[in-house]
């Protein structure tokens, strides 16, 4: 269930203590002329240790925007603490034709979630707010490229209203690759995965089209993340990747090859951080040595001689 208020989308996840899934999807909602969805993911499969929040561009909106589109968005994720304070994280990110889903992720590593520790789970509920500060269409930079925020209603039962259905048409085009519906821009990428790893989804059982597409998009996002250099990937990104990879494996994907790559990136990241720490230490040591050298080379005072 979710509710819209101008440029904000509020999502309440209920019955958290009894959830048996580590990945949840909000309803679709329309803001700035684009359809979006939020994904909540728990590393520990219980939504009590940590929480990753991901914003995705809906597949139908990606199709509607056509070839070569890109969209800049400035977002604030807020995890509402119902007892004391609010935990939020601001994100500025670019969505485009190649990375329209799972493109922007933020992880809240805040320890225990339940009301006895942090106040994020109260009466079995977590409250999440996504606020859009700015959306800019980078394909055509004009007065119309930044459409005004549009409020879209949900029915009392939490289902999408007819207004939203009219605003977001059905998926116009997708191509099936090994049983997965993907965007035309993703076809070659997905084909390459199945050519190199034919058993990657052999034990993946879900048959729902939306669920299958969401999992495939997670896989593509993980691969894109790990293609970056360790310097470009943050520690939070890698923590989130570890959690998502675990979920993918639990869902039936065979990803030993991707896990190996992730471990390599983690090792490189640790080495990079270690080298950077050592470089800072060396710089401090050099400053001390220079100061000592200047002190040694300084002329003696009269009192030092007489």
UniProtKB/Swiss-Prot annotation:
**Which ranges of the sequence are coiled-coil?**
253-298
Domain MATH spans what residues? Answer: 6-132
Per UniProt, which keywords does this protein have? Coiled coil
Would I find Coiled coil among this entry's keywords?
yes
Per the record, the domain of life is Eukaryota
Q: Does the keyword Membrane apply?
A: no
**TM stretches of this protein:** none
What PANTHER family does this protein map onto? TRAF-LIKE SUPERFAMILY PROTEIN (PTHR46236:SF11)
> What is the designated name of this protein?
MATH domain and coiled-coil domain-containing protein At3g29580
Task: Give the classification, highest ranks.
Answer: Eukaryota, Viridiplantae, Streptophyta, Embryophyta, Tracheophyta
